[in-house]
């Protein structure tokens, strides 16, 4: 086991902390590390003593505290740099795929982000682990050290991360023509208060934000929850309710007459950003370049 200290912290202890967080329990971490559970417990306690902080909540699954998140992020960054160095030196294991974890919002996944992955050169040898999360919350996964990069609506960089604007995703207030004729025939502020609405999940605030722009406290309480981007759009096209549809998904359905934009002057733009660890990592650099190129081709400037 490598025990060289980084900034005074023994790497075996930091790696053990990461294993406990990833595996969820001390016993599972011991199995993954091929050591005894007592060795895992001793390493974590030694690290907590060295830092003077409680690093884990002893729950099931185990969760890092705010201080623990800093060290989890450190452990993942060290692992990333080790794999890059191994690949550059052609050492044993250099041919193994490199795993890159990214947090992405559902609408980006459904419209443009997968295209970015196909732009990454195959010789980079990357395997992607995507975590779907609302664009307002993806930065939290970066902060926790759960992912290396994220598509986020936040322009404020997470500590230790760089940020660049990708472009604007436009959302259009849409409904099926039949639904619009039945429920949306009148001033938007009046009809939106009563018309059934489709929302992604209970954290989806897009439709309520649209209603607030019209001077309403929220959209109708008659709402359908459809927690996939494709299903959300299909539910609106099927006439279940109205909703804010990403422009790339709305365009073909508007052209086909399956959707109508019932308030064209009230589109909503969300500026998306790319945040990633501030590391000199070829793997992250290749992904960031592909993401920027695809976003430029898909999103509004």
Predicted regions and their residues:
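A late-sequence structural motif
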Residues: 264-301
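Alpha-helical linker/hinge and terminal dimerization helices associated
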Residues: 50-51, 71-93
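A short LG(V/I)-centered, amphipathic sequence patch enriched
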Residues: 48-66
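Hydrophobic two-helix hairpin corresponding to the core of helix-turn-helix DNA-binding domains
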Residues: 17, 29-30, 65-68, 239
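Secondary-structure junction motif
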Residues: 193-217
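Hydrophobic hinge/microswitch elements
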Residues: 137, 217-262
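Central regulatory/effector-binding core of bacterial HTH transcription factors
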Residues: 95-159
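Short helix-boundary/capping micro-motifs
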Residues: 18-34
